[in-house]
């Protein structure tokens, strides 16, 4: 992978500005690019001995502004920021997009440099899943069986396994995740509590394109026509919020309205629309408390997810 890292200062600035805008000013600090677990642990041990707090942002790379918002939050709240770039094979099912998932290490390094990341961790698959590997971490029960778990039954086992491994290696004070992957964040929070990880899970707001489409590395798969229709997912969620603000409290009614809206989008095929408790992910017939309205929709072979969280008081709005 070394050839991807031999980029000039000008290349780093150009790549960063394409994502961040012209106000991006990549620093010339010594961001460490680490591949080995041994070197990572060495860097973490040094930071701990110096009394530094550690913020961690786990990603699969091909970074976008959503990822960068997590890095900025981590930079603001911690002395040392670690970002991992690893396309985790165990969270992909058969016939999913593991091989096609976008990768660009040079571009990612430019963006991390611009955000003053201290350590960029690029482990090899063989380092994290060596021959003979047989151990997995799994949150059991309805939380991982609903929503994305219905159509991706092994997905969250792969997510919790790799995140647990990374937590053990990085030992962060805080780990940062995006609200777009709301179910993932809830599952990881459950795992962290159950396994007594001494850290805080920080969930940051969804970052959207100008037309409302939630930022995702998979957006690059969309054809021009699909990209034109994809913002209707967010429009359907905004409509659902407006329904709640006007007093609607029926989960099925909100779900049907969203499905009707999305079915009007050319090429959209609904995987699920769900109205659930934001913490337990249990389906709600009547809205109360913290509510998550989530959806997954396919445009061709591209599967997009989005959600909105609403704090519904017992009294009518």
Task: Please tell me what each predicted stretch does.
Residues 10, 54-55, 296-297:
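Short hydrophobic "helix-edge" motifs at membrane interfaces and signal-peptide entry regions
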Residues 8-9, 27:
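Serine residues within intrinsically disordered or low-complexity segments
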Residues 257-317:
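Phosphate/ribose-recognition catalytic cores of enzymes acting on nucleotide-derived substrates
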Residues 27-268, 276-280, 308:
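Nucleotidyltransferase catalytic core that binds NTPs
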Residues 14-16, 24-25, 29:
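Ala/Thr-enriched low-complexity intrinsically disordered regions
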